[in-house]
């Protein structure tokens, strides 16, 4: 029978600091409200009839509290060496991993805030996490350098038991960082969704880490908990203000900060495949959105659902374009997606020619297509429920289905 593992002292200190971080986040966000509005870092909620100015980029506050917690926490995992001198040799590789991870997250918070202020283009959004992930990749190279993977059972007759990916493994880790930071950013647009999905993912990772504390990779999962516990509580404080009806917007800063934090623990904690499984809804949303993200199908600047002021419910938003402007590939994708029930396509004509409309290709709009118009709060709850189901499926795969592919 599984017993709850004994927590080391640094984790208890981390938990206490995280609880203080929750209080600090809840307190600081309303305290800085006026400063953000005065700096014109504010906007209107397009899904509300009210045109009140709401402060944006509040992820920078939860991110700053997160960093302060971990900066103050740095000495505690190494107290035996600092104070009692009981260790034979200082664990430099653990110290470098901690500092390198903090550097990557700190860079991403800074670059995310720059994006909120400067309103960068999408091509820049791909470059920012790539640059911020370089310290992370260097830490992995100097501390571990292992690029060999265990081949799944069905492929072993062809590739053997182990396969050295070499530089491709670093490309994979860099792409993982880019995906994590942008995946949360493109599944957004309604109150509480960005912070809510991040909260569910972090809670799932914490549970996974605790279960694995009695395993062979205890130190890696303790390292992950050092980051996930404060992230969970600072995000909870942010969600308190971002929940419907939202009093603040989290901004791209939070999406980048959350994504890089997940990438850090997934890469340095050596469970990147499990990490990706926790991103199931985000992976589906990304694949579903690809035709618009690649501009095969015209993509408007905002793809969030639209408010029906008469019913007070959110409905699907649409992309409208001239039919003749669509390429052969775009036409083919539209027809296939429509036949599969993934898109609503409408055709019309006026004096300017023939036009085509299709709902914007996001998971949010797809749920509205399947379940019909719904209240914004209920839509957020449905999406978070889907995230929880994704985590449950991940645990089933990780501890049951994995036996079909690996020797565990």
From Swiss-Prot:
It is found in: Endoplasmic reticulum membrane. It is an enzyme of class 2 (transferase). Keywords: Endoplasmic reticulum, Glycoprotein, Glycosyltransferase, Magnesium, Membrane, Metal-binding, Transferase, Transmembrane, Transmembrane helix. The chain crosses the membrane at residues 11-38, 59-78, 92-118, 122-143, 167-186, 193-213, 219-242, 251-269, 272-293, 376-400. Optimum pH is 7.4-7.6. One of its GO terms (molecular function) is glycosyltransferase activity. Inhibited by natural nucleoside antibiotic tunicamycin, which acts as a structural analog and competitor of UDP-GlcNAc. Activated by Man-P-Dol. Activated by manganese. Inhibited by diumycin. Residues 39-58, 119-121, 187-192, 243-250, 294-375 are cytoplasmic. UDP-N-acetyl-alpha-D-glucosamine binds at residues 44-46, 56, 191, 301-303. One of its GO terms (cellular component) is membrane. It comes from the Eukaryota. Its main location: endoplasmic reticulum. Residues 1-10, 79-91, 144-166, 214-218, 270-271, 401-408 are lumenal. It catalyses: a di-trans,poly-cis-dolichyl phosphate + UDP-N-acetyl-alpha-D-glucosamine = an N-acetyl-alpha-D-glucosaminyl-diphospho-di-trans,poly-cis-dolichol + UMP. Its cofactor is Mg(2+). Glycans are attached at residue 146. Its EC number is 2.7.8.15. It is a multi-pass membrane protein. Homodimer. This is UDP-N-acetylglucosamine--dolichyl-phosphate N-acetylglucosaminephosphotransferase.
